[in-house]
A protein has these predicted regions:
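Beta-rich, blade/repeat-based domains predominating
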Residues: 20-33, 60-70, 98-110, 140-150, ...
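Conserved beta-strand positions in repeat-built beta-propeller and related beta-rich domains
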Residues: 37-42, 73-79, 115-120, 155-160, ...
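Blade/loop signatures of beta-propeller domains
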Residues: 1-12
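Short loop/turn segments that connect beta-strands within beta-propeller blades
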Residues: 48-52, 85-89, 127-131, 169-173, ...
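Blade-level signature of beta-propeller repeat domains, shared across WD40, Kelch, NHL, RCC1
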Residues: 187-221
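WD40 beta-propeller blade core
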Residues: 45-46, 82, 124, 166, ...
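A short beta-strand motif characteristic of beta-propeller blades
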Residues: 12-20, 52-58, 90-96, 132-137, ...
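Loop/turn-rich, solvent-exposed surfaces of beta-rich toroidal or solenoidal domains
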Residues: 143-164
Length: 221
């Protein structure tokens, strides 16, 4: 891959949420079909994307990515990934995180977890039961949040004051689309609502930003 392979277009920020009470940072972000979940360090917060109101709070550590498999939450916490019952907040199982504390984003797709490696500039597909690495995708940027939507793999980047949303090929890692965030609007966590929005964690801003997802298109060859 080269830096000039795909030119970026400006990301369209539709709405901002937060900061939330008692939370000065947002790490991972996921969407359960109704609520947006944000990992804020000591707690997981679920909020209504229509009203912006906080609906649930779980006392669970979350210092990086968050994912949802349709039933359970998965949360990067230090050097592990916790499988959490969102109804009770109980941790049902834990596996070692592949980066041993250096992990960033987290997503669920194809029956597996996809884990962003920030400084290693990689995305790993891992077995959700064992943590075994099934696939490695190389990036040429620091990787933050990771999201899968309609078969498309997207990840956030964060270098200095610049962040992008990138659509990449799941086999080669080639960059297919780039959405550039305004300077200073950085991306930590990332998740799609399954429709036309991405929810982007804003790191130390304590905010979550809704960004317009581009219409799905056939990748150019």
């Amino acid at each position: 891959m080269t830096r000039n392979e795909t030119k970026p277009t400006a990301a369209e920020i539709v709405r901002e949420y937060g900061p939330f009470p008692g939370a000065d940072k947002v790490h991972g972000v996921t969407h359960d079909g109704r609520h947006v979940w944000a990992a804020t360090g000591a707690k997981l917060i679920a909020f209504d994307p229509e009203s912006g109101d906080v609906a649930r709070t779980l006392d669970r550590t979350g210092d990086a990515g968050t994912a949802f498999d349709g039933t359970h939450l998965y949360q990067l916490a230090e050097a592990r990934i916790d499988k959490i019952d969102p109804k009770t907040g109980n941790v049902l199982a834990s596996i070692p995180a592949p980066g041993q504390g250096r992990d960033s984003g987290l997503a669920w797709a194809e029956g597996a977890l996809w884990v962003g490696q920030y400084r290693d500039r990689k995305i790993l597909k891992i077995d959700p039961s064992t943590g075994a690495v099934l696939r490695t995708i190389e990036s040429n940027r620091f990787v933050t949040g990771v999201s899968f939507v309609d078969g498309e793999l997207w990840h956030g980047t964060w270098e200095g004051d610049e962040s992008e949303l990138r659509h990449v090929d799941t086999e080669s890692g080639a960059v297919l689309e780039r959405l550039a965030m305004p300077t200073g609007k950085n991306i930590s966590g990332l998740e799609s609502d399954g429709a036309d929005l991405f929810y982007c964690g804003g790191g130390p801003s304590g905010k979550v930003r809704a960004v317009r997802r581009p219409a799905k298109r056939t990748a150019q060859r």
